């Protein structure tokens, strides 16, 4: 997905490996997938994203772990997705994590989400309208559709204080 996928190193890795060119999801119990160390954050010489430089970025479907690329046999060990999620993928639902920050089993319990519900007041500039607010609504609606978020909207009230365009006459 061109809107969501990034051809760079940073960002959350997609939990996807490929069998005969078809994407397969890594099961939730085997997450998170941690980005491997790489020496350079540039694309490969043949134009693959930076994760194409990683030497340990293959999925062992039997051991359910990330292994060396040299072990890829297309029978039980397969290549992992080389693109990553954009930076906003992990930062656009942060308020939900605050609701249950000590929870080590899920991003937040249903009890905490139902108790806290959505943010009472969000204050942000107009630059948020096509950035963070848009993505926050996307994630909230996605999580609501999947049964993880209790409310349709992430913020009850929004105050947009505007944007500074130039010098002020006030001292």
Per-range role (PLM):
Residues 1-171:
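Structured secondary-structure scaffolds
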């Amino acid at each position: 997905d061109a809107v969501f996928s990034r051809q760079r190193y940073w960002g959350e890795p997609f939990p996807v490996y490929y069998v005969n060119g078809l994407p397969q999801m890594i099961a939730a119990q085997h997450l998170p997938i941690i980005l491997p160390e790489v020496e350079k954050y540039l694309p490969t010489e043949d134009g693959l994203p930076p994760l194409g430089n990683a030497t340990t970025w293959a999925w062992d479907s039997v051991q359910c772990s990330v292994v060396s690329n040299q072990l890829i046999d297309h029978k039980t060990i397969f290549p992992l997705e080389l693109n990553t999620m954009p930076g906003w993928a992990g930062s656009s639902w942060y308020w939900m994590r605050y609701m249950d920050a000590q929870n080590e089993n899920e991003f937040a319990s249903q009890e905490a989400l139902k108790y806290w519900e959505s943010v009472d007041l969000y204050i942000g500039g107009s630059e948020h309208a096509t950035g963070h607010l848009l993505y926050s609504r996307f994630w909230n609606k996605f999580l609501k559709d999947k049964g993880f978020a209790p409310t349709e909207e992430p913020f009850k009230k929004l105050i947009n204080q505007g944007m500074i365009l130039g010098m002020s006459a006030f001292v």
